[in-house]
């Protein structure tokens, strides 16, 4: 089964934005990004001006995909958490539900323990929203499948006849 595109309403987006905004403040992080596993940014909070969000989103998705490959090599389903420690800034990357990736950038003014604690709570809330979005998409897809297009029986030959080719 192929994955459906993630389509959400404004209300759901605002809920996601509120959760990551709260996470950014509560964890004393510089920036929080929510991206999907395809590398598309969904939402962000914090000082994002100095960061190339598009590159960050796609590289994070690639990092998660590569790490999934490593997990499978050693018999794990996945590694749900990645941590990269730098001289000034650190990256905490975690999987949210089946589709999301939460990226938290923090420095020495916060701690890994605080970030992990706050991410755990936010991840549960975000996963619930993703689940609702996927359930709605699944319901809409099954309703659409029952709809038969009036154009489904038109062939290229019929179009050529119509325009006199």
Label every PLM stretch briefly.
Residues 2-29, 38, 42-165:
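Acidic, low-complexity cytosolic segments
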């Amino acid at each position: 089964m192929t994955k459906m595109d993630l389509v959400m309403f404004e209300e759901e987006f605002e809920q996601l934005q509120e959760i990551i905004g709260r996470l950014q403040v509560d964890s004393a992080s510089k920036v929080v990004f929510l991206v999907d596993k395809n590398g598309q940014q969904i939402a962000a909070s914090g000082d994002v001006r100095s960061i190339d969000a598009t590159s960050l989103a796609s590289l994070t998705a690639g990092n998660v995909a590569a790490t999934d490959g490593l997990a499978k090599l050693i018999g794990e389903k996945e590694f749900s958490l990645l941590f990269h420690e730098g001289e000034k800034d650190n990256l905490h990357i975690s999987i949210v539900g089946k589709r999301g990736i939460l990226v938290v950038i923090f420095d020495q003014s916060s701690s890994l323990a605080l970030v992990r604690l706050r991410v755990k709570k936010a991840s549960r809330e975000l996963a619930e929203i993703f689940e609702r979005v996927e359930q709605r998409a699944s319901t809409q897809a099954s309703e659409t499948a029952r709809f038969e297009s009036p154009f489904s029986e038109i062939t290229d030959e019929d179009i050529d006849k119509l325009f006199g080719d």
